[in-house]
Amino acid sequence: MKMHVCFSVILMFLSIFFINGALSKLERLKHPVKKKSDGSLSFLVIGDWGRKGGFNQSLVAHQMGVVGEKLDIDFVISVGDNFYDDGLKGVNDPSFEASFSHIYTHPSLQKQWYSVLGNHDYRGNVEAQLSKVLTQKDWRWFCRRSFVLSSGMVDFFFADTNPFVEKYFTEPEDHTYDWRNVLPRNKYISNLLHDLDLEIKKSRATWKFVVGHHGIKTAGNHGVTQELVDQLLPILEENKVDLYINGHDHCLQHIGSHGKTQFLTSGGGSKAWRGHVQPWDPKELKLYYDGQGFMSLHITHSKAKFIYYDVSGNVLHRSSLSKRSAHL
């Protein structure tokens, strides 16, 4: 009888392990936190940048270096469209050095870069950007379709948003997308949503940030990505995710309301000034800047502060969230 009970208990724990652990296939990483007096984590976010220094990319990179030095940043996040116009042709494409290694040269930017893919990256050889060969060329480079990064009091959930966008499949125009390891699309999306939801629910971090390329709430030129509104936004809301960070629209933007997920766009890494703004509730639209720039985040256990900068390093917008009174 006792053996039967013990065996049943073991089976129960094994079942729980396989249900909650093995079904998530997202790669998990840990970034060690520096020992700072306030125990904080600092990083920069840049998107839509890779133009071999053109369209003010080099100027933005310089200001990133200046701010990165002041904040003593831990790492940099890239929200996609890393190489224009059509990603990389292969691991030996000179665009990697011309748009990345030779541009972000400031000492403060010699930190780990964590990157996701944008739609322009999918127009090239996706496997090249995911390859360890690039890491051998420049140790800072790390790019995956989707993954989880833990650093101190923050868990980051990087999500590949490109396959969600139906028109890339039904109306590709004259573009060719590299959908290797993505098809069948519906299964890929279903698995990703399952894994994201599972990983976010498992997280015990103080702060939970989701990072993707496409916007969920945006007044930018591209407008909202309805597929993400329908499929990803409910997961963010159910799990009380603090921030959704994206690029795609070539602007700097903050949309948010009291007590809910804040939506931060940092897509001003190079070409910008689209001159088109979608109508949006002014109570939610805290910042819309149709130009080049980037953002910084400084995180402690009690506060998440974020600042937007233009191409000259001028501060455009400051805001913060507090854990002591939920969201501000």
UniProtKB/Swiss-Prot annotation:
Residues the record lists as binding Fe cation: 48, 81, 84, 250
Top-level taxon of origin: Eukaryota
Keyword Zinc: yes
Active site: 222
Entry keyword annotation includes Metal-binding: yes
Gene Ontology CC terms: extracellular region
Residues bearing glycans: 56
Keywords: Glycoprotein, Hydrolase, Iron, Metal-binding, Secreted, Signal, Zinc
Cross-referenced InterPro entries: Acid_PPase (IPR024927), Calcineurin-like_PHP_ApaH (IPR004843), Metallo-depent_PP-like (IPR029052), Metallophosphoesterase_PAP (IPR051558)
Gene3D superfamilies to which the protein is assigned, alphabetical: 3.60.21.10
PANTHER family found in the cross-reference section: PURPLE ACID PHOSPHATASE 7, TARTRATE-RESISTANT ACID PHOSPHATASE TYPE 5
Family the UniProt entry places it in: Belongs to the metallophosphoesterase superfamily. Purple acid phosphatase family.
Subunit architecture: Homodimer.
Protein name: Purple acid phosphatase 7
Taxonomic source organism: Arabidopsis thaliana
